[in-house]
Regions:
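A recognition module on extended beta-rich or small alphabeta surfaces enriched in W/G with H and D/E
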Residues: 170-183, 190-230
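A surface-exposed partner-binding patch
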Residues: 2-174, 235
Length: 235
């Protein structure tokens, strides 16, 4: 399915809205080149992520190269008549740091990963994140939180979850990690300090360590819930 529309390079309101709202992303001397290309989403993508596919089909799409890196700008009008959207980064598979589950790779092949979002729903999964899904930024395990987690488990006399093979595919600005376990594809949030309404503690684990999202079990559930949050927010 072709979703790309030709954009006027000197009159792209969507990109100007992004530039104004995410002013820190572009440098004063950033080299910006708009491309006239077509975005194709596969039948497999549409079957795996029907809600996300519907959202993408409603988007205004701009293909842009920023400082020699390729991006797609997806833009919509929200219920308050503001332009909102995602700047998605496109990467070659050899830039990925970790082996991913097939659904994650499928998503990246079709639309890339979210580098920035703007004017988003207040409680959406994209809010306040450093990246979402981007292959080159994913990592295994909980990283610098290992000592904190060990201490919390020792204090609460809980058995540690072995998360060394979990893949973190979202990194929040406050350090929280959204991860999946590759075999089961189940999604978890590791957060030391959260104020989310959509998560719950895991039984037999210390509070403010591993959590589960309400209404989300697997990676595909997470993607579709993210899409649904935006579908309800746009016109």
């Amino acid at each position: 399915m072709k979703l790309w529309r030709k954009k006027e390079m000197d009159n792209n309101r969507d990109f100007e809205a992004f530039r104004n709202d995410v002013s820190w992303f572009l440098k004063p001397n950033s080299d910006i080149v708009f491309k006239d290309s077509e975005l194709m989403i596969s039948e497999e993508f549409k079957k795996t992520f029907p809600k996300l596919s519907g959202l993408i089909q409603k988007a205004r799409v701009s293909n842009v190269e920023i400082d020699s890196e390729s991006y797609i700008l997806f833009a919509w009008d929200n219920v308050d008549n503001q332009i909102c959207g995602w700047l998605n980064k496109l990467e070659l598979a050899d830039s990925y740091k970790c082996e991913m589950i097939e659904e994650h790779e499928l998503l990246l092949r079709n639309i890339g990963g979210i580098k920035e979002s703007f004017n988003e729903p207040e409680d959406s999964f994209t809010n306040n994140q450093n990246f979402v899904f981007i292959g080159s930024e994913c990592m295994r395990g909980i990283g610098d939180w290992d000592d904190y987690y060990s201490m919390m488990c020792e204090d609460d006399k809980c058995e540690k979850i072995d998360s060394s093979n979990y893949l973190a595919f979202v990194y929040e600005a406050n350090g929280a990690l959204t991860m999946y376990e590759p075999e089961s594809k189940k999604v978890f949030l590791f957060s030391h300090d959260h104020c989310f309404d959509n998560v719950e503690f895991i039984e037999n684990q210390p509070e403010y360590t591993f959590h589960k999202f309400k209404n989300v079990d697997t990676f595909t559930d997470y993607v579709e819930e993210l899409a649904d949050q935006w579908v309800k927010f746009i016109k």
